[in-house]
Structures are given as C-alpha cells and as structure tokens.
C-alpha cells in the first residue's frame, strides 16, 4: 500500500508515476481530496474534544462550588452529539480513502523502462546459446507422453484441464529438480521453510493479492473462516513477520520454500492449453527477503543472480528482462523476469520473476524493524521464483532430448536421480 503522505506532498509526481502503470490522474485527485477532508474532520473533532474536556472541568468546578451548571451541561451534550456525528463522517471518509489506496499499485522505480505493456520491457542480458538440433525437437508434453512420465489425459479425467500426473522417472525428475534448487539456495544463505498452504484473508491482503485479485485464487471455508489456497509461497513466507518489529541487526533475512501453487488462471482461456507452462497446480521454489530500505535494490540483484545460477548449473539458455512499468506486478517497484529457452516453441518463456516491493507489502502487513538509534521503520520485502519447478522440467525435457526419444539428465541432477543419466 502506498503512503498517503507521499501522495499528498508530491501530487503531480504521484500522478506521473502511476500514469506509467495505467492509473488515471482522477483517482489521485479523488484520494487527495478525501484525505484533505479526513484531516479537516480530525482537526475539528480534536478541537471539539478539547472543548468538551474544558466544559467537563468547568462543570466539576461549578458543582464543587454548588453553582448552577445547567448551561454547561447542555452545551457539553451538544458538543458530544457533534463529535459523534463527526466521528461517523470520519469513519466513512477513511473507508473511502482506504478503498482507493489499497487498489493503487506500487510506485515504479526510476530504473524500470516506462511503458504500459511487455513490448516496452528491456532485455538486460543473455546466457548461453540455444542448442542447434539436427532433428525436429519435440514439445515437452509430447516427450513426456511418449516416455510415459507425464499423463495429462488421466489428470483431465480426475481434475479437469491444466493438471498433470508425473509418473516414474518423471516424478523423480520433478523431485530431483526441486531438491537441487533448495540445496543451492541453502548454500546461498536462505533458511528453508515448510509453510501452510492455506492462508487467511489478512495474509492475502498483506502481500497484495487481496482485494484486487480475488478471482485469481481458490477459496474455501475452514470452521467458518474464509481461507485461500496459496498462489505462491511468497504469501506465507512474507506474512511470517506480519505485525512484528524486527531487530535491524538481523537484516537482511532470507527465506526459501517449496510449495504447490494454486491458480485459477482467470483470463487465460486459450493460452498454453497444453503442457506444463500454465497449470492450476504446480510446484515452485520461492525466495523471500526482508531488508533495510537502502539495501533492497542490491538484494534484488543478488536474488536474481541466485535464480540465474540454477539455470547456469543446469546449462539451460536464458535471458533476463526488466519489466516495463505497466507490466510489473501490482506490488512491485522493479521486476526482473528470467525466461528460459524452449526449443519446440523457438522462444524464451518465463521461469522466474524477481521483484523488489520496497515498503509496499510491509505497510500493508505492518512488518517493521528497529534501527540502531531505536527508530522503527518499515522493512523492504523482495520475492522471486527460484524456480518454477514444472517449467524447469519442461525446459530440461526439451533442451536435453535426443533423437532416439531419450532425455539426458543434466549432470548436477544425476546424484538426485540415483545415478540415472538418461530417461528412456
């Protein structure tokens, strides 16, 4: 959530920044006007409460002196009624301010390319050259079905579209991939976590999914309480410190976790209908950081490098792009997308998204730290995929396929596969 004081003191700047994210200037004008009304109501209410307290003292003095206090008592009742009315107005105006504020996205960082869609995103670097095949490479879903390690048809029978069964060596490959990722991140200083997969509404609000993106998730009720299946481990990892004040000496804090991610994929009809790219349920290894404000953008570079190192170790070609202001996620000030090469599609596809959310999530979730001078400040939060496991499996199947239909296991995964060097 944005700081209303920043908007109030930098109205035109806020309009210009949020215009690059598709926000109409009228929304900023409205929230500024409501904020001005809110502050005026607060001033008037405080004045009346001060007058009421003075009147109360005058009544007490009059009673001690056995004087008539009828007028003061009547005046105090009138003041009390006015305060009650102003409090109701204040609550209504505050609700309107909050309604707008919680739906405004984060301010983009100056280093992000300006533009409303992905066509304005900027490629930063490429790593490795895509393999040249002397045969027509198959798509990963065809490879998986031919090898009997992926079964989309039976998953559709059981659950519907965008689900899969991993079988045999396929299941083992998935497990090898995420165990390798977790081990790598542990070496980089991340503390491994196993999180809840169901979270409450406060948690979804804290990381910015609610109230704007309720249609993108699956919800249920637990003992009368609405709960959400997590769309990413970012939600439980970030909310671990919700409503807490951390010791600044502990920062930065790194967490990593494997979890299933559940997504309704609302609005994705007709896109990536085959394969492992766009699923309703998939495994993902997540990275989350809590940092001091002055360290967060440097920590974003390090987090992105941590995700890249997985692909380098697996020798999977990729490139890194900085998302345009209008293409970044709701909570992000700056996002790097890492896209891996898929030969059958002859293109790069997203496999990781690493974002610096600055103090946007921390303000919503009230995650703070106490600095060495005793001052309490909001932390900065970062999150990134390290990596999406199913998409990594897809990239391995396509990039390591052989003409005879087998798939070579990337060398770092061989120990995790019990010494197996090929599937098929």
From Swiss-Prot:
Pathway: Aminoacyl-tRNA biosynthesis; selenocysteinyl-tRNA(Sec) biosynthesis; L-seryl-tRNA(Sec) from L-serine and tRNA(Sec): step 1/1
Keyword NAD: no
Residues that hold L-serine according to the record: 232-234, 286, 385
Reaction equation(s) it catalyzes: tRNA(Ser) + L-serine + ATP = L-seryl-tRNA(Ser) + AMP + diphosphate + H(+); tRNA(Sec) + L-serine + ATP = L-seryl-tRNA(Sec) + AMP + diphosphate + H(+)
Main subcellular localisation: cytoplasm
Assembly behavior: Homodimer. The tRNA molecule binds across the dimer.
Protein name in UniProt: Serine--tRNA ligase
Organism: Latilactobacillus sakei subsp. sakei (strain 23K)
Gene (name only): serS
């Amino acid at each position: 959530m944005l700081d209303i004081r920043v908007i109030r003191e930098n109205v035109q700047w806020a309009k210009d920044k949020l215009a690059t994210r598709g926000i109409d200037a009228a929304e900023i004008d409205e929230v500024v006007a409501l904020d001005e009304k809110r502050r005026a109501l607060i001033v008037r209410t405080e004045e009346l409460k001060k007058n009421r307290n003075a009147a109360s003292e005058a009544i007490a003095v009059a009673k001690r002196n056995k004087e008539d206090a009828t007028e003061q008592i009547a005046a105090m009742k009138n003041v009390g009624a006015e305060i009650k009315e102003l409090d109701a107005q204040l609550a209504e105006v505050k609700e309107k301010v909050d309604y707008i504020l919680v739906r405004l996205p984060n301010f983009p960082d100056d280093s992000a390319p300006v533009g409303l869609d992905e066509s304005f995103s900027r490629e930063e670097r490429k790593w490795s050259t895509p393999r040249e095949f002397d045969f027509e490479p198959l798509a990963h879903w065809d490879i998986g079905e031919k090898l009997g390690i992926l079964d989309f048809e039976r998953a559709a029978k059981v659950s519907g579209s965008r689900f899969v069964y991993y079988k045999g060596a396929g299941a083992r490959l998935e497990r090898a991939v995420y165990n390798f990722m977790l081990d790598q991140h542990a070496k980089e200083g991340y503390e491994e976590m196993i999180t809840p997969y169901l979270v409450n509404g406060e948690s979804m609000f804290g990381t910015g999914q609610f109230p704007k993106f309720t249609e993108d998730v699956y919800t249920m009720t637990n003992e009368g309480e609405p709960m959400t299946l997590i769309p990413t481990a970012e939600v439980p990892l970030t909310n671990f410190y919700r409503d807490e004040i951390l010791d600044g000496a502990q920062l930065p804090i790194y967490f990593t976790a494997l979890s299933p991610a559940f997504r309704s994929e609302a609005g994705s009809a007709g896109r990536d209908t085959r394969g492992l790219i766009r699923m309703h349920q998939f495994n993902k290894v997540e990275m989350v950081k809590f940092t001091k404000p002055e360290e967060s953008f440097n920590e974003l570079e390090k987090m992105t490098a941590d995700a890249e190192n997985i692909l380098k170790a697996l020798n999977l070609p990729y490139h890194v792009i900085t998302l345009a202001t209008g293409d970044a996620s709701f909570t992000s000030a700056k996002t790097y997308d890492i896209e891996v090469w898929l030969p059958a599609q002859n293109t790069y596809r997203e496999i990781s998204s690493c974002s610096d959310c600055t103090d946007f999530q921390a303000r919503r979730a009230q995650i703070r730290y106490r600095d060495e001078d005793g001052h309490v400040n909001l932390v900065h939060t970062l999150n990134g995929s390290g990596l999406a496991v199913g998409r990594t499996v897809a990239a391995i199947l396509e990039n390591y396929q052989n003409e005879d239909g087998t798939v070579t296991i990337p060398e770092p995964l061989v120990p995790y596969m019990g010494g197996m060097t090929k599937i098929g």
